[in-house]
């Protein structure tokens, strides 16, 4: 199947999650309301693209005439599990905001998305609003971009271990690193960032 644009991925993920929860597909108005698309014409254009690319088929003269095609082999809907700060640490948000469709080959068990807030990672081409694909793991190698909990608060930074201390380095020259020395704080690696996705709308 052809690759999807970010907005098409969002539409497909919402349809998939809606069907899983309700047992039937959403209407065009429900899709428009959830994704804040102005009017059903915009939704129709996204559905036409998804149908053309082989992800769904549509039935004429039916308000819920959407059927998914070939989902088990190619795509998976992952939760956007909240917000992580690319800046100063902040309390983690763990409510499921939405679902986002991604190629199954990119996913290992437990992988999830977090929405980026802040600009501390701009030199790594990670900006506010991006979706960070996070693979859960408790360890990291130097230079890995990680989601870490620092004294119970979440942050997204580049990881370095230096002798007996850990440095969480921003990719913004205007921001200082977070240094965790023995006995001065608690840090835990939540996962490694393995991909960045940027909605275009």
Curated annotation (Swiss-Prot):
- Positions annotated as active site in the UniProt record: 120, 157
A Gene Ontology annotation in the biological process aspect, one of them, is: SOS response
**DNA-binding region(s) from the entry:** 28-48
What molecular function terms (GO) are annotated for this protein?
DNA-binding transcription repressor activity; sequence-specific DNA binding; serine-type endopeptidase activity
Q: In the Enzyme Commission scheme, what number(s) does this protein have? A: 3.4.21.88
- Asked whether the keyword Repressor is assigned, the reply is yes
Answer yes or no on keyword Coiled coil.
no
Instruction: Give the matching Pfam families.
Output: LexA_DNA_bind, Peptidase_S24
Catalytic reaction(s) noted? Hydrolysis of Ala-|-Gly bond in repressor LexA
Kindly list the residues the record flags as site (Cleavage). 86-87
Extract one GO cellular component term from the record.
protein-DNA complex
Q: Which UniProt keywords apply?
A: Autocatalytic cleavage, DNA damage, DNA repair, DNA replication, DNA-binding, Hydrolase, Repressor, SOS response, Transcription, Transcription regulation
What Gene3D superfamilies has UniProt attached to this entry?
Answer: Umud Fragment, subunit A, Winged helix-like DNA-binding domain superfamily/Winged helix DNA-binding domain
Question: Could you name the domain of life of the organism this protein comes from?
Answer: Bacteria
Functional description taken from the UniProt entry: Represses a number of genes involved in the response to DNA damage (SOS response), including recA and lexA. In the presence of single-stranded DNA, RecA interacts with LexA causing an autocatalytic cleavage which disrupts the DNA-binding part of LexA, leading to derepression of the SOS regulon and eventually DNA repair.
Subunit and interaction comment: Homodimer.
> What family classification does the UniProt entry report for this protein?
Belongs to the peptidase S24 family.
By what name is this protein known? LexA repressor 1
């Amino acid at each position: 199947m052809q690759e999807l644009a970010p907005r098409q991925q969002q539409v497909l993920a919402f349809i998939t999650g809606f069907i899983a929860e309700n047992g039937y597909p959403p209407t065009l108005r429900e899709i428009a309301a959830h994704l804040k698309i102005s009017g059903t014409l915009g939704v129709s254009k996204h559905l036409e693209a998804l149908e053309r690319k082989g992800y769904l088929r549509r039935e004429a003269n039916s308000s819920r005439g959407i059927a998914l095609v070939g989902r088990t082999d190619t795509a998976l809907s992952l939760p956007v599990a909240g917000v992580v700060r690319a800046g100063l640490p902040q309390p983690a948000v763990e409510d499921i905001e939405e679902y986002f469709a991604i190629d199954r080959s990119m996913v290992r068990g437990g992988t999830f998305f977090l929405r980026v807030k802040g600009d501390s990672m701009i030199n790594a081409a990670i900006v506010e609003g991006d979706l960070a694909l996070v693979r859960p793991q408790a360890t990291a190698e130097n230079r890995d971009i990680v989601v870490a909990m620092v004294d119970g608060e979440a942050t997204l930074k580049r990881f370095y271990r230096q002798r007996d201390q850990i440095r969480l380095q921003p990719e913004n020259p205007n921001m200082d690193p977070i240094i965790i020395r023995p006995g001065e704080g608690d840090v835990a690696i939540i996962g490694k960032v393995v991909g960045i996705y940027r909605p275009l709308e």
